[in-house]
């Protein structure tokens, strides 16, 4: 039951992320994602990559990472007068803001602005880590033991206790706060099942002193440093006032405290109005100020606006400064003034593309760190033969889906890695839309219309199955309808079953389905183990039941390989296996489409998009 509950939580996050992107709603900017992804242990989604720069630290026990400076500081520019408010909109409110138990996407985006991690990736070269709360770190030769030295004088945000109304002044963050975080997550009575799974390979964590932390992992794993630097501290003095013992049940259900955030990050949550807005103000004692990486913007207001058209009208009325657009909005409205004619893309700066007369909104576009797919339950005999799966992909008109569903704002893909990373092998081209070749493959696998009723059959069994659809999701509805029509012309009957999220998740968890359509969010480099290793088919995220001994061996080798070039080669070999096996019909990596107010300065599109904390408002 515990494993099932953990998977329910995980799939809820998965579906939430998929639906956010399906509707074209951008809830965070790239820096917000930067923090969320690198905090892999906190978010229950995969985090950022390790690189040759990190490998150098792992190779020798005496070598240290850069000490004290954070080179991201060069991307922050401060006007003579700091201040101003960034106004954005999100689609829905959230429940708990507890950084351990709160697992909704909206909560994660807000928590990310208010807290910090030990390390952060370089904006320009996201495969490299920069010290954030950590001043330095050392890694043992086998990558298992990591020694972290914290920066001095990092402060918790002050707060008013929700029960006593007593003001609590800022306290110093120590290594013990990181240990407390891990202890809470690993407490089996805490509702942190999906998060807890990321700590299964953690041997120990201990505070050597207030500023020294030792983290030991059980196995040689290339992500051990990444996961360590993704740790956040947890304020014991907030959750256990007056040195009270930790109460896991109260921690889960303390609605007053879980409606607040006490962090040590760039912003402080100062107001929350249910179903209306969140207000965050710059934390003036943020340690990033000493590193020149503190935001210039004084305030951020996140308004809750459910209707996408209403959000667009607010942007046009100058009531919002930044908004994610759907592909339809981008094509239909974004091509006209006041939107810019030019489009800012990866590697470009707004200063190189000044707005023209009549343009007040800047358009930005870059590939999302996500992809969507159609998955086949391989336990079902219909999908056991890879020739059948290859045929199904060749019957899926993905170019039509890209054109009619995503309005040509995306790219058809052939594998599971982040498209703009070296781990994705671009030499492996997606299978073409080829109904004639598909019918040949189906015939070779024994499928033909023996009774003339228009439906393929084999050994008396008709080629009929049901695909699950998230109810109320127009993108899934459209793409599955296109797929259904493609299949029908080939003599395959695919029925579509719209289901509410809880039912959909339950069926995934029980493996009680034939075909599904979902999405995965990705970092530059992901560990395929959780989604693709055969050991994860029973209770893990390998819900389709993919089992391939050669793939398993490569996945296991990827985890043990610290050399980046070798790991890239292994990922390419793994992608080739998936391309041959076609357990998924890989669909689309969508474009992230955004519009920004022309009053925002210091806008630059990095490999993972925009870093909103670098922005300032022109005076």
Show the residue positions of the predicted features.
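Ligand-site clamp/hinge motif
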Residues: 252-258, 285-348, 484, 493-495, ...
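Detector for C-terminal structural segments
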Residues: 18-28, 33, 37, 69-70, ...
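Aromatic- and charge-enriched surface segment that lines or borders ligand/interaction sites
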Residues: 135-190, 214, 311-314, 382
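Gly/Pro-rich hinge or "lid" segments in bacterial periplasmic/extracellular proteins
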Residues: 116, 122-124, 229-295, 299-301, ...
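Alpha-helical secondary-structure segments
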Residues: 174-177, 210, 214-216, 265-266, ...
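N-terminal lobe/hinge region of extracytoplasmic solute-binding protein
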Residues: 71-74, 84-141, 183, 262-264
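Ligand/substrate-recognition segments at binding pockets and active sites
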Residues: 88, 274-275, 293, 299, ...
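Surface-exposed binding/hinge segments that line
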Residues: 190-245, 268
